[in-house]
Amino acid sequence: MPEREGSNPFISSMDTFEKIAYQEGYQFIAGVDEVGRGPLAGPVVAAAVILPPDYVNTEINDSKKLTAAKREELYKIIHKDAIAIGTGIVDTETIDHINILRATLQAMREAVLELPISPDFLLIDGLHRIPVITPQKPVVKGDSLSISIAAASIIAKVTRDRIMEIYHRQFPQYNFIQNKGYGTKEHCEAIKQFGICKIHRKSFHVKNLKQTSIQFTP
C-alpha cells in the first residue's frame, strides 16, 4: 500500500525523545523549531508546540517534506489537538541588528514564552540551546526525529508563509507569494530591477547581487 503524502515510515521513532523525557518525570514537553534563516527578505519565525502524551499522527513530519496544502491541513489539526502552541516572530530590522543566529534564538525564546502553559522540558531543532532556564535538549535534524519538533516546524512554516503572502500584496514586484523571500533567480532579478524594499535583509548583502541567483532552499 502506498504511503500517504508526507507520512513518515520511521514514525515509531518519532516519539523517542518525548518518551525519554516523560520517563525522566517531565510533564509538558515542547518541541521548538524555526523557519526563515535563509531568505533574503522577511522575518524569522519560530513555534513551540506541546502535544498530548502518546500523541500519534503519522502525517506530521518535517515541514520541508510536505506540500503547502498538506501543511495547511496539518496546521489546523495541530491547533486542534495540541495542549499549547506559541509563536515568535523577529523582523528584518532586528535580524540586521543582531545577526540571523541570535534572531533565530530570540524567535525560539519568544515562542516558548508565548506558550499558555509553561513547559518543563524543551526539544529544540538544531545545535543550539535557547536563552531560557527551562531544561532543554537540542536535536540535530529534530524535525525528522521528534513529532513535537515536526509539529512546531509546520506551525512556524505556515505562519511565515502567511506573513509573506501579506508582504506580497504590499510589494508584488518581488513575487513573495511564490518565493517566500528566498533567493530564487526571479527574486534576485527583481532586486536588480527594483532595488530592495523595507523587508529585505541588508545584512545579507542583497544590494550586491551578482548575475547568478543566491542558492537557498525554500
What positions do the PLM features span?
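RNase H-like, Mg2+-dependent phosphodiesterase core
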Residues: 1-218
